[in-house]
Amino acid sequence: MEFIKKLEVWFIVGSQDLYGDEALKQVYANAKQITQYLNSRNPFIQIKLKPLATTPEDILAICRAANYEENCAGVIAWMHTFSPAKMWIAGLTRLDKPLLQFHTQFNKYIPWNEIDMDYMNLHQTAHGDREFGFMVSRLRKPRTIVVGHWQSESVKQKLDRWMRVLAAIYDQQHLKVARFGDNMREVAVTEGDKVEAQIKFGYSVNGYGIYQLVNSINAIKEEDIATLVKEYEADYQLVDSLKEGGEKRQSLIDSARIELGLKAFLDKGGFKAFTDTFQNLYGMKQLPGLPVQRLMAQGYGFGAEGDWKTAALVRAIKVMSYGLPNGCSFMEDYTYNLEDHNEVVLAAHMLEVCPSIAEDKPILDIKPLGIGGKEDPTRLIFTSKAGCATASTIVDLGNRFRMITAELQAIAKPQDMPNLPVGHAFWKLEPDFDTGTQAWILAGGAHHNVFSLDIDADMLRTFAEYFGIEFIHIHAKTELADLKNELRWNDVAYK
């Protein structure tokens, strides 16, 4: 995630020449103070103050410059005074970076004894931002609005959350996804229009032969494998058969070789997300379980069975949640515990669940895998942390992409499961099991999802809105009749 350190957000402050030089100097001084304060609080992305925007020509020049500045991830616009919005038409029409409208004002409180018309003219965000907001709406331009005083903790949190989405948007527009093999045969939802995805999101998806990956795996040096195995021993609880001298020790060494070869291939090609499928493993000793789990923990996106849309979304949410404590993972609704009025989803996958979500130190084990026809694969076994969470997916409906995000309550495991050989999570659906399940299925939600304990639906909505894709939110107040209407209306709106 080193690229995040290079990013910047441009702060554009609107006014007009009508107020005169002294007032404009004060506007800029106030904007500079706000910028310095926000940057002093370690924002996710640093803010760069630009010259005042007081004429149509100024605004157009700044917006064009933002488009062409590679490291500019987005733009914050604030109307300190009134800034006639027709001046903003040319610039906003051309701006293609994410936009945040910052509805704040320099002074937190009205100076009751001193306030006069000079003060009123200088501090006009209350109606200056309404003028600006009208034009953004008139142009049908997506934007995030943050309301509140610039020194408040809630504003800092809102700005940081928006910046995290910016980083994910930036990354998607530069992302390369590698596919090893094709889709799992006859599976529908993992298919999709890769050309349209590149047009809409910016990321590219290309396929590579398993032999190319195998060549990379076979080129790994023995000393590098030994170093990685020591890392395994330090980070995880190894079962006896994988410890030095154990009867399955060679399988652990093979896993290390696969991990290093896979990472080398991805890094050489600049890929930050990838897919594989158990039906295309020619030349490999085992399906990559542990290697995929560890690469996800390092920030790579992943989708099983050729699911490139989910691989890209895992990567996006990995970027959004960089530095946060609870993790996210590729995931699948697997089976249910249907106790009356206490239904629980057991979510997992064959192998590939990211240990960033683990509650405790994972167990590194080796177990048979009934599909794929290869040697027993190593894998990390653990239970997810508990807490508020989301499950998200993107599906291709033929004429558009739809993102679906469901709010969840991840819970501690109800009972021990000594024979379950995979990483897993337990959750309860919002608003209840029946409604939440029906809502996901009605919306066409995939059987794969991205499970996150850090990223909420509002952030994912912002992500979807920027790319102009449909967003369906399943939450504690979801009513099926309302959802059916929303889906019906969206079919018309997105034609």
Swiss-Prot record:
<dbReference type="InterPro" id="IPR024664">
    <property type="entry name" value="Ara_Isoase_C"/>
</dbReference>
<dbReference type="InterPro" id="IPR003762">
    <property type="entry name" value="Lara_isomerase"/>
</dbReference>
<keyword id="KW-0054">Arabinose catabolism</keyword>
<comment type="function">
    <text>Catalyzes the conversion of L-arabinose to L-ribulose.</text>
</comment>
<comment type="pathway">
    <text>Carbohydrate degradation; L-arabinose degradation via L-ribulose; D-xylulose 5-phosphate from L-arabinose (bacterial route): step 1/3.</text>
</comment>
<dbReference type="GO" id="GO:0008733">
    <property type="term" value="F:L-arabinose isomerase activity"/>
</dbReference>
<dbReference type="Pfam" id="PF11762">
    <property type="entry name" value="Arabinose_Iso_C"/>
</dbReference>
<keyword id="KW-0464">Manganese</keyword>
<keyword id="KW-0119">Carbohydrate metabolism</keyword>
<dbReference type="Pfam" id="PF24856">
    <property type="entry name" value="AraA_central"/>
</dbReference>
<feature type="binding site">
    <location>
        <position position="332"/>
    </location>
    <ligand>
        <name>Mn(2+)</name>
    </ligand>
</feature>
<dbReference type="InterPro" id="IPR004216">
    <property type="entry name" value="Fuc/Ara_isomerase_C"/>
</dbReference>
<dbReference type="InterPro" id="IPR038583">
    <property type="entry name" value="AraA_N_sf"/>
</dbReference>
<feature type="binding site">
    <location>
        <position position="305"/>
    </location>
    <ligand>
        <name>Mn(2+)</name>
    </ligand>
</feature>
<feature type="binding site">
    <location>
        <position position="448"/>
    </location>
    <ligand>
        <name>Mn(2+)</name>
    </ligand>
</feature>
<keyword id="KW-0413">Isomerase</keyword>
<dbReference type="GO" id="GO:0019569">
    <property type="term" value="P:L-arabinose catabolic process to xylulose 5-phosphate"/>
</dbReference>
<dbReference type="InterPro" id="IPR055390">
    <property type="entry name" value="AraA_central"/>
</dbReference>
<comment type="similarity">
    <text>Belongs to the arabinose isomerase family.</text>
</comment>
<keyword id="KW-0479">Metal-binding</keyword>
<feature type="binding site">
    <location>
        <position position="349"/>
    </location>
    <ligand>
        <name>Mn(2+)</name>
    </ligand>
</feature>
<dbReference type="GO" id="GO:0030145">
    <property type="term" value="F:manganese ion binding"/>
</dbReference>
<dbReference type="Pfam" id="PF02610">
    <property type="entry name" value="AraA_N"/>
</dbReference>
<protein>
    <recommendedName>
        <fullName>L-arabinose isomerase</fullName>
        <ecNumber>5.3.1.4</ecNumber>
    </recommendedName>
</protein>
<dbReference type="InterPro" id="IPR009015">
    <property type="entry name" value="Fucose_isomerase_N/cen_sf"/>
</dbReference>
<dbReference type="InterPro" id="IPR055389">
    <property type="entry name" value="AraA_N"/>
</dbReference>
<dbReference type="GO" id="GO:0005829">
    <property type="term" value="C:cytosol"/>
</dbReference>
